[in-house]
Regions:
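Short gly/pro-enriched beta-turn/loop segments at secondary-structure junctions
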Residues: 147-149, 173-177, 192, 216-220, ...
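Short, conserved beta-turn/loop elements at beta-strand boundaries and strand-helix junctions
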Residues: 124, 187-188, 202, 228-231, ...
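Short aromatic-glycine motifs in intrinsically disordered, low-complexity regions
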Residues: 204-214
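Short, surface-exposed secondary-structure edge patches
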Residues: 48-52, 236, 278
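Pseudouridine synthases involved in rRNA/tRNA modification
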Residues: 1-33, 82-84, 213-220, 230-234, ...
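RNA pseudouridine synthases
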Residues: 1-201, 306, 311-317, 328-332, ...
Length: 336
């Protein structure tokens, strides 16, 4: 027999849905039978399949262990690396500095050692996450970053935080800032690039157009050049729209591709500066700027967080021209 106390993440769901998640190997036919014969009870009493569970309810299941989730020792996330760069953490969210080379979610090449796998392991070992107890929610990422790009990723610890942050992302109340190194220098020190983008799903590439064409979506990329050295420009970028490969494709369209970008840039140009196999792009800063109610996350309003280390700052200023780690990142001048 196993007992479960209904927590915040399981509140208001149907009894049968909860049982499916608590005992995923229990056949549907037995589920109905066990509820009917009182082998599954809510607060010590027989309940209907459609019963909506409330916070604090106790669900008792007098069923064999074979119907429950696999044992702790076989959880895949326990095989993930323990290494996490945590920028900020509280009871609702985590902000992680994802390093280049780490996947956010599993793919065909890497199933276990991913950012979400590491987060699950970390919270499990802290006692904040248990697959047996939190049956309707697991730690979830609010945003994702490509494997070859590093930077800040937001993780939600509970369903309410995930709901709020997903809405805030949609409403553009989370501002994400990137650092990148461009080959060349934009015509203006700062500005907003406005164009249109079409994604080729099969090739996983995008194309940029000056004017709207069928199936295209508007893109807006705000930028400011911080410094230019030896034909390379360290640039801060804010995405005003969030499209696939937007930063990489947009700057390449204007003749200033990202250093190291083999997909939208020029390998010949890249080789002039070294044998880099990844683009110089990092999501280094995040600002919460709520214009509507943020519920349990209201305390985050107007707060800004930065990643501690951007790997290519030192590369950009290589040779001791500028001490990049202590340099104040502000533009010399601004043009409109």
């Amino acid at each position: 027999m196993k007992s479960f106390e209904i927590e915040k993440n399981d509140e208001s769901q149907r009894l049968d849905k909860f049982i499916h998640k608590a005992a995923p190997l229990l056949p549907q036919s037995l589920l109905y039978k066990y509820i009917r014969t009182k082998r599954i009870k809510v607060n010590g009493k027989r309940a209907e399949i459609s019963t909506r569970l409330r916070l604090g309810d106790k669900v008792d299941m007098y069923i064999n262990d074979e119907f429950f989730e696999k044992k702790e020792s076989t959880y895949d996330f326990l095989k993930a690396s323990k290494h996490l760069d945590i920028i900020y953490e509280d009871k609702n969210i985590m902000l992680l500095d994802k390093k280049v080379g780490v996947l956010c979610h599993p793919d065909n090449e890497e199933y276990v050692d991913t950012l979400i796998g590491r987060i699950k392991r970390y919270l499990y070992e802290k006692g904040e996450y248990s697959p047996d107890r939190e049956n309707s929610f697991v730690p979830s990422l609010v945003n994702r970053i490509d494997r070859n790009t590093g930077g800040i990723v937001i993780a939600a610890k509970n369903a309410e935080s995930l709901r709020i942050l997903n809405q805030k992302m949609k409403d553009r109340e989370l501002h994400k800032f990137y650092l990148c190194v461009l080959i060349g220098r934009p015509k203006l020190q700062s500005g907003i690039l406005k164009d249109y983008l079409i994604k080729d799903e099969k090739k996983n590439t995008v194309r940029i157009y000056k004017k709207q064409v069928p199936s295209s979506k508007e893109i807006r990329t705000k930028y400011r050049v911080i410094d230019t050295i030896d034909g390379l420009s360290l640039t801060e970028v804010e995405l005003l729209t969030g499209r696939t490969h937007q930063i990489r494709a947009h700057f390449a369209f204007y003749g200033t591709p990202l250093l190291g970008d083999g997909k939208y840039g020029s390998n010949e140009q890249n080789r002039k500066y070294g044998s880099y196999k990844r683009q110089f792009l990092y999501s280094y800063k995040l600002t919460f700027d709520f214009t509507t109610d943020a519920g349990i996350l209201s305390y985050l309003d107007k707060r800004t967080f930065e990643a501690g280390d951007v790997w290519f700052k030192e590369e950009f200023y290589k040779g001791g021209i500028v001490n990049a780690t202590s340099r104040h990142l502000s533009p010399k001048r601004s043009e409109s």
